[in-house]
Amino acid sequence: MKATLINYGVGNLFSIKAGLERVGFNVKISFLPEGDEDVIVLPGVGAFSAVSSYLNSMKDKFNELRERGVKFLGVCLGMQVMFDEGTEGGLSKGLGWFKGKVDKIHSNVKLPHIGWDKLFVNKDSCNLTEGLDGKYVYYVHSYVAYTNDYVAYSEYGIKYPAIVCNDFAVGTQFHPEKSSVTGKIFLRNFYSWVKR
């Protein structure tokens, strides 16, 4: 299966590329969708305001791809920009694929949050969490999505969404490519979800 990893022009994309390739995806890094992919991946690098502006410029193309059955994976910031809006870098509109607002973690904890936290499965309507409940995944973030609709969550001062999904998009606040065996299990589950 073909995956296009969208390059926002910042950060190292090779670890997420390698993680996707390990579970069977043929990955190409590009500034724009290729048009023949099965999956578009929005990586977790950059700031919400700049990245959401860049991705919203492609929203019509994304909608065409969705109608064709293309699936989307957002990692960390890539998940956050799938929500209605975010405050990092000033209030900005997201893609609006999930209801909710992305804001700083509202708690007296050290930020950024860097490290391993446990996953708790909430309600998995997308069959993405087999083998994940109670396992640890790796986070690097200061912002979270404030929403009540999530597949799995973690806790750091507050409970926050770790995995979200709908019929065409999946988002993870954690970095599967940095989450060792648990990350690989998630990416395998995602591969199976795309194949369905």
Swiss-Prot record:
GO cellular component: cytoplasm
Pfam families: GATase
GO molecular function per UniProt: glutaminase activity; imidazoleglycerol-phosphate synthase activity; lyase activity
Start and end residues of each Glutamine amidotransferase type-1 domain: 2-196
UniProt KW keywords: Amino-acid biosynthesis, Cytoplasm, Glutamine amidotransferase, Histidine biosynthesis, Hydrolase, Lyase
EC number, as in UniProt: 4.3.2.10, 3.5.1.2
GO BP of this protein: L-histidine biosynthetic process
Catalysed transformations (reactions): 5-[(5-phospho-1-deoxy-D-ribulos-1-ylimino)methylamino]-1-(5-phospho-beta-D-ribosyl)imidazole-4-carboxamide + L-glutamine = D-erythro-1-(imidazol-4-yl)glycerol 3-phosphate + 5-amino-1-(5-phospho-beta-D-ribosyl)imidazole-4-carboxamide + L-glutamate + H(+); L-glutamine + H2O = L-glutamate + NH4(+)
Localization terms from the record: Cytoplasm
Gene3D superfamilies: 3.40.50.880
InterPro entries assigned to the protein according to its UniProt record, in alphabetical order: Class_I_gatase-like, GATASE, Imidazole-glycPsynth_HisH
Pathway recorded for this protein: Amino-acid biosynthesis; L-histidine biosynthesis; L-histidine from 5-phospho-alpha-D-ribose 1-diphosphate: step 5/9
Domain of life: Archaea
Residues at the active site: C76, H175, E177
Entry function: IGPS catalyzes the conversion of PRFAR and glutamine to IGP, AICAR and glutamate. The HisH subunit catalyzes the hydrolysis of glutamine to glutamate and ammonia as part of the synthesis of IGP and AICAR. The resulting ammonia molecule is channeled to the active site of HisF.
UniProt subunit comment: Heterodimer of HisH and HisF.
Name of protein: Imidazole glycerol phosphate synthase subunit HisH
Species this protein is from: Sulfurisphaera tokodaii (strain DSM 16993 / JCM 10545 / NBRC 100140 / 7)
